[in-house]
């Protein structure tokens, strides 16, 4: 799919072909909401969520039978600059923990009946150090984007996007700095717990990387290639694949939103099918969501990653669907509707 044209241009072409929502289905969902046994608007954002799902699933009564968390894992060459509190080996160790069912995301998915798939992206071959050269070649970027697209099986009715990768808050900060400007300090946070000299090294790495690649950063896809990582490209591909299949998406936190921000910078409508699952405690995430035009569903002070915040939001989304499809209308319940003013 991505091999016929110049690699990055083929990604751009796909983004430009993404289908719109069904306004007819959304209108029908809102009409049903108006007839349910409650004051109009009294369920707040639950009503908005139900109409949102209806618009992307293309039916007045949305379903939520096969939600999936897809976690993409990768390692980053910039870790060699001492930007993380943990070594790259932790990424593989966490893959084993996911497989054994011992991670937080396993428990959250189990609690809410959400499927979980974890995808390793060449963990033993980190991307290049972004302070010295581009993270990936264009062909590698496109191939990884395509892998992310193919990772989304048919039958999924809600996709939660997550990540795992030592050093990936550094590349996410570099992406936001490149896209939105300001200073590195505006976007760099503590990630998995860096402080002191390590935090200063992280800040310096982001400054150096963006300065090195600045002549090429007017193109968001070059931002992804030069400053990103394999999980960033794969998550971007998964988000686009979901759109092509009319699958609504729940974004997780800070790093996932770096992939989302790339798509949004290419096309402002690219994230119309996405909800923000939560507000991360990684400081700049709130500003990122503001720029993406997303209001988070949850704010629990989390900064774990793994798709954990998105998975937690599934419980809320399931409640929205249950109310929308299971509540009686005024006529069905033989309850009088609103009278007068």
Swiss-Prot record:
Q: Which UniProt keywords apply?
A: Cobalamin biosynthesis, Glycosyltransferase, Transferase
Q: Which organism is it from?
A: Methylocella silvestris (strain DSM 15510 / CIP 108128 / LMG 27833 / NCIMB 13906 / BL2)
- Any idea what job this protein has? Catalyzes the synthesis of alpha-ribazole-5'-phosphate from nicotinate mononucleotide (NAMN) and 5,6-dimethylbenzimidazole (DMB).
**Record NCBIfam families:** cobT_DBIPRT (TIGR03160), PRK00105.1 (NF000996)
Q: Hey, which family's this protein in?
A: Belongs to the CobT family.
**What molecular function terms (GO) are annotated for this protein?**
nicotinate-nucleotide-dimethylbenzimidazole phosphoribosyltransferase activity
Gene3D superfamilies membership = 1.10.1610.10, 3.40.50.10210
Entries under SUPFAM superfamilies matching the protein: Nicotinate mononucleotide:5,6-dimethylbenzimidazole phosphoribosyltransferase (CobT)
Catalyses which reaction(s): 5,6-dimethylbenzimidazole + nicotinate beta-D-ribonucleotide = alpha-ribazole 5'-phosphate + nicotinate + H(+)
Quick check: keyword Nucleotide-binding in the entry?
no
Active site location = 306 (proton acceptor)
InterPro entries the record matches: Nict_dMeBzImd_PRibTrfase (IPR003200), Nict_dMeBzImd_PRibTrfase_bact (IPR017846), Nict_dMeBzImd_PRibTrfase_N (IPR023195), Nict_dMeBzImd_PRibTrfase_sf (IPR036087)
| Pfam families, alphabetized | DBI_PRT
Supply the PANTHER family for this chain.
NICOTINATE-NUCLEOTIDE--DIMETHYLBENZIMIDAZOLE PHOSPHORIBOSYLTRANSFERASE (PTHR43463:SF1)
Example GO BP = cobalamin biosynthetic process
From the Swiss-Prot or TrEMBL record, give the protein name. Answer: Nicotinate-nucleotide--dimethylbenzimidazole phosphoribosyltransferase
Q: Which residues form a coiled coil?
A: none
């Amino acid at each position: 799919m991505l091999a016929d044209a110049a690699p990055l241009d083929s990604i751009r072409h796909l983004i430009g072909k993404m289908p719109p929502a069904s306004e007819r289905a959304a209108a029908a969902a809102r009409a049903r909401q108006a007839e349910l046994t409650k004051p109009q608007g009294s369920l707040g954002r639950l009503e908005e969520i139900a109409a949102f799902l209806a618009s992307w699933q293309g039916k007045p009564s949305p379903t939520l039978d096969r939600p999936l968390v897809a976690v993409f894992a990768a390692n980053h060459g910039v870790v060699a600059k001492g930007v993380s509190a943990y070594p790259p080996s932790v990424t593989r160790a966490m893959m084993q923990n996911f497989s054994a069912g011992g991670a937080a995301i396993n428990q959250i998915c189990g609690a809410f009946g959400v499927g979980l798939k974890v995808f390793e992206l060449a963990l033993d071959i980190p991307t290049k150090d972004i302070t010295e050269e581009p993270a990936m070649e264009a062909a590698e970027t496109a191939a990884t984007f395509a892998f992310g697209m193919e990772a989304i099986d048919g039958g999924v009715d809600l996709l939660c996007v997550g990540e795992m990768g030592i050093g990936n808050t550094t590349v996410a900060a570099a992406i936001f700095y490149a896209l939105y400007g300001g200073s590195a300090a505006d976007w760099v946070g503590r990630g998995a717990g860096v402080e002191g000299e390590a935090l200063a090294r992280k800040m310096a790495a982001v400054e150096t990387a963006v300065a090195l690649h600045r002549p090429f950063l007017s193109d968001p896809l070059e931002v992804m290639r030069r400053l990103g990582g394999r999980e960033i490209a794969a998550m971007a591909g998964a988000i686009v694949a979901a759109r092509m299949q009319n699958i609504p998406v729940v974004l997780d936190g800070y790093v996932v939103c770096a992939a989302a921000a790339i798509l949004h910078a290419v096309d402002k409508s690219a994230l119309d099918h996405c909800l923000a699952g939560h507000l991360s405690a990684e400081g700049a995430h709130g500003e990122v969501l503001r720029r993406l035009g997303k209001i988070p569903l949850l704010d629990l002070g989390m900064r774990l990653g793994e798709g954990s915040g998105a998975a937690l939001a599934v419980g809320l989304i399931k409640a929205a669907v249950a109310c929308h499809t299971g509540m009686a209308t005024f006529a069905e319940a033989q309850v009088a509707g609103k009278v007068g003013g």
